[in-house]
């Protein structure tokens, strides 16, 4: 069932821009509901505390409504990667034919000593450019090497050109959180409806 929306006069609602995707394999069981035109409500339970926090931040700062249910029966690696796959599929499905979307979005986001850039093109052509380093292998039970794998999975399953760059930073927690928030704000911009755009935002006739 869709999350009940709160009133939001500053954000145009578009009926039907939501999707539910389930991925069940011998390694993971992931279920995600994604609503593009939301209010930032999130119900997340992957079994990985820090990852849950990042997904809630993604929902809050992108104003998406998100439900995520996962498991860590095998390991955190598979759960994080498969969550990225399912979230990307849900984003793609929720956007439907992509008519009148802005298509491009970007964000330059600071968090204390950290500055992160994210740029998105919902072109249908998946590609990830990721530039970030972490001074620790883990934040809680979250392996920092999985940040890139998560965004790779999203970019390829959603069909988006995704660039994420750490401009500078020291604290791994701050860098990762800034990446998730910058991604959220860039995706919010790219998925918004612009009534000046008639049909698809491309000269090719297809995205």
Regions of interest found by a model, annotated:
Residues 8-10:
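Intrinsic-disorder-associated, low-complexity terminal segments enriched in Asp/Asn/His/Tyr and depleted
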Residues 14-207:
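N-terminal intrinsically disordered, cationic/polar leader segments
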């Amino acid at each position: 069932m869709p999350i009940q929306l709160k009133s939001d006069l500053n954000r145009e609602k578009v009926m039907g821009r939501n999707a539910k995707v389930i991925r069940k394999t011998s390694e993971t069981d992931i279920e995600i509901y994604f609503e593009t035109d939301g209010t930032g409500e999130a119900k997340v339970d992957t079994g990985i505390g820090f990852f849950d926090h990042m997904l809630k931040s993604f929902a809050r700062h992108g104003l998406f409504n998100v439900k995520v249910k996962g498991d860590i029966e095998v390991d955190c690696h598979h759960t994080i990667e498969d969550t990225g796959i399912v979230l990307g599929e849900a984003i793609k499905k929720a956007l439907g034919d992509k008519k009148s979307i802005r298509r491009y979005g970007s964000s330059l986001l600071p968090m204390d000593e950290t500055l992160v850039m994210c740029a998105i093109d919902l072109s249908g052509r998946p590609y990830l450019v990721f530039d970030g380093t972490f001074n620790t292998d883990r934040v809680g039970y979250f392996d920092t090497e999985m940040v890139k794998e998560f965004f790779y999975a999203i970019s390829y399953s959603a069909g988006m050109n995704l660039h994420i760059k750490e401009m500078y930073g020291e604290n791994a927690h701050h860098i990762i959180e800034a990446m998730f928030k910058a991604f959220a704000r860039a995706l919010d911009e790219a998925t918004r409806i612009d009534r000046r755009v008639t049909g698809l935002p491309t000269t090719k006739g297809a995205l």
